[in-house]
């Protein structure tokens, strides 16, 4: 398996441990439906938390969280929308990003959990209520 896949899996394990220590309930890991995928789906008593995990090795030019661009945020939003509809979840959804930086030996150098990293982004056709047009 490619090093980046191993690194990604290691970052997800570190993120899972962090979330559990913070009291989150893990609902799904690497949830997939068609081409849709969510790294981690967790929950609190008040909300569903969709977590995108980005892992890099120390010295990588791009910070992990910078890899979650507008296109990626939209895909995550669409996947979360599908997850919520599929399981009839009636909780607000929050999108977090966990950035993991590994040292050369593979140990965790830094972990950063950014809550409310971005809002729900959907295409108009996926919105449950149409927007009103101004006259």
From Swiss-Prot:
It holds the Pfam family UPF0102. Transmembrane segments: none annotated. SUPFAM superfamilies: Restriction endonuclease-like. It comes from the Bacteria. GO terms for molecular function: nucleic acid binding. Belongs to the UPF0102 family. PANTHER family: UPF0102 PROTEIN YRAN. This is UPF0102 protein PG_1874. It comes from Porphyromonas gingivalis (strain ATCC BAA-308 / W83).
